[in-house]
């Protein structure tokens, strides 16, 4: 898998940005080896994005073991789920290269060819130490008590069923022995639910590596919940269905987790309940196209992460890329909460159509509310009808950084949209920047929105449905103006603008500098807590970079010329027609 550069963003930039390039403003941030500006004065090799590349960053499988330092407190549903609170002192060794039937420490081990079954019955504190290789075998665990499976250089391939079949129904602690490589794979035959199947809770620990390949169904499947913890280095691939599947919850507390799926409408990480991400680095690649579900009678697309309940991101990193038609990066049936961490999403496929139904590509989609209070979210969609961030209900941003560069609407809510803090960038290549189908409230934060051109607008609300844009606070830059009928409690000002140019907007003692796109809507609207001043053609040194270097807070501004600002009032001719254009396909 091709490696790409990942440049970490620091708070203070030491680079100097120059203005008035004749090229597209994004092109100067394309990776040029070690000379790329990163908005933080530091360059490090790794995987995924390059700061300054909102429109060009990539996502690739990265099995390097260095975990992100940013992490929230680990979450486990039950105190018994912590390995350190358990004592598995009764070890039973199983060598799959030369399996031996035996009864040891109350554990019965039976062997049939390369297939091994171990039953610890009512014995407590049992730890199976598994090593060796089998190309036509399996390991099945039975028992009435919780247990541990320590993988210490085990390689299991079962052409006919699951490679590791944990049928106890009790807690299963998978311990990846440090310094060992372990592999599990099934074949294309059989009715197994996964190459690694667990009937009970599945809890990963240890700092070894594990590769799981599902060729018949899922890669890893638990009928209960799954927890990944710091130190894990796990790669999962499925050519037939989902990568990782859990019925009752998925909790990513740390570790390195890489997932690839290729089947139509398959999900990289799929949970029938809640998903919580607190740490680690999770990378998911999905390549399957959409498909028509004859049972549900609807078109469906693949997704990097799919939660049937809620998704919460508190820390760590998510890197998601979907190249199939109708695909999503994140698809949540209930609420999506982003409290911290970093989320990077790419979708490349276009809309999928079948049987008079459609599945449209989305970076992040939630049927419930979306709330952002911290962290960083970058989204890019390039396929036809692809929206960046979409909720069927309300959107609330109170902090963090949100940047969406989308084919269709960059950020869309079916109901109310409220921005009261944070830094928000929204560029719709063929539609609005921010689009609320209810009221849109901007109360604080810094908002930089760009639309494609008339009749679209940078910031839109559903005036046709009787709703409005209410601007009462914050710092606002809108390339393409505001929807007609806006209620502007905070004064707004307008001017013309030049493409590919750096501007500095100063409000009181605070300066926000931004680079304009190569094309966009007519007219520029700006607003701040007090009357702003605007300069064009400036250079900026220092400051804090946002949106991949397209916006800078603070820093030292030099050069340029003053821009004449005139008062902007709603309906003054810059905004588009009736707002609140319908979302580009809810599914």
Language-model features: locations:
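Positively charged n-region of N-terminal signal peptides that target proteins for export
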Residues: 1-5
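C-terminal motif of bacterial Sec signal peptides marking the signal peptidase cleavage site
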Residues: 15-19
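Residues within alpha-helical transmembrane segments of multi-pass membrane proteins, especially transporters
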Residues: 13-14, 282
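A composition-driven surface/loop motif
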Residues: 21-587
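Sec-dependent N-terminal signal peptides
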Residues: 7-12
């Amino acid at each position: 898998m091709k490696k790409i550069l990942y440049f970490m963003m620091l708070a203070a930039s030491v680079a100097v940005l120059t203005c008035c390039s004749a090229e597209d403003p994004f092109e100067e941030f394309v990776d040029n080896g070690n000379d790329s500006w990163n908005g933080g004065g530091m360059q490090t090799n790794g995987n995924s994005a390059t700061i300054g590349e909102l429109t060009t960053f990539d996502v690739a499988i990265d099995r390097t073991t260095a975990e992100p330092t940013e992490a929230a407190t680990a979450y486990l549903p039950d105190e018994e789920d912590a390995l350190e609170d358990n004592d598995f002192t009764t070890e039973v060794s199983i060598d799959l290269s030369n399996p031996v039937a035996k009864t040891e420490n109350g554990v019965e081990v039976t062997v049939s060819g390369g297939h091994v079954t171990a039953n610890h019955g009512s014995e407590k504190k049992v730890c199976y130490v598994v090593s060796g290789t089998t190309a036509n075998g399996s390991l099945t665990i039975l028992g009435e008590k919780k247990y541990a499976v320590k993988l210490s250089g085990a390689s299991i391939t079962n052409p006919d069923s699951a490679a590791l079949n944990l049928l106890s129904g009790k807690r299963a602690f998978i311990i990846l022995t440090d310094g060992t490589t372990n592999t599990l794979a099934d074949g294309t035959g059989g009715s197994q639910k996964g190459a690694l199947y667990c009937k009970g809770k599945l809890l990963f620990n240890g700092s070894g590596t594990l590769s799981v390949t599902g060729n018949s169904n899922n890669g890893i499947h638990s009928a209960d919940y799954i927890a990944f913890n710091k130190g894990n280095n796990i790669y999962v691939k499925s050519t037939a269905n989902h990568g990782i599947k859990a019925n009752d919850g998925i909790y990513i507390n740390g570790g390195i987790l890489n997932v690839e799926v290729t089947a139509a409408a398959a999900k990289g990480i799929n949970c029938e309940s809640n998903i919580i991400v607190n740490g680690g680095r999770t990378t998911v690649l999905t390549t399957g196209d959409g498909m028509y579900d004859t049972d549900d009678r609807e078109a469906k697309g693949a997704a990097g992460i799919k939660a049937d309940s809620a998704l919460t991101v508190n820390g760590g990193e998510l890197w998601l890329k979907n190249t199939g038609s109708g695909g999503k990066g994140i698809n949540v049936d209930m609420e999506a909460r982003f409290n911290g961490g970093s989320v990077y999403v790419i979708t490349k496929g276009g809309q999928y159509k079948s049987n008079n139904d459609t599945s449209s590509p989305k970076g992040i989609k939630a049927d419930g509310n979306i709330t952002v209070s911290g962290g960083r979210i970058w989204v890019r969609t390039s396929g036809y009808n692809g929206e960046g961030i979409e909720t069927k209900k309300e959107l609330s941003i109170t902090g963090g950084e949100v940047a969406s560069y989308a084919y269709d609407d960059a950020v869309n809510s079916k109901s109310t949209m409220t921005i009261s803090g944070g830094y928000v960038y929204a560029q719709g290549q063929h539609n609005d920047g921010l689009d609320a189908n209810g009221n849109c409230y901007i109360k604080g934060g810094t908002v930089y929105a760009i639309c494609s051109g008339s009749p679209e607008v940078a910031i839109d609300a559903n005036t046709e449905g009787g709703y409005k844009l209410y601007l009462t606070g914050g710092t606002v830059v809108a390339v393409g103006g505001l929807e007609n009928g806006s209620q502007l409690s905070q004064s707004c000002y307008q001017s013309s603008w030049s493409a590919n140019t750096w501007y500095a907007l100063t409000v009181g003692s605070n300066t926000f500098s931004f680079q304009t796109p190569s094309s966009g809507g007519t007219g520029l609207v700006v607003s701040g807590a007090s009357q702003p001043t605007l300069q064009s053609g400036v250079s900026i040194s220092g400051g804090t970079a946002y949106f991949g270097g397209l916006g800078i807070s603070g820093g030292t501004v030099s050069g340029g010329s003053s821009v004449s600002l005139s008062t902007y009032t709603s309906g003054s001719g810059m905004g588009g027609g009736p707002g609140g254009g319908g979302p580009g396909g809810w599914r």
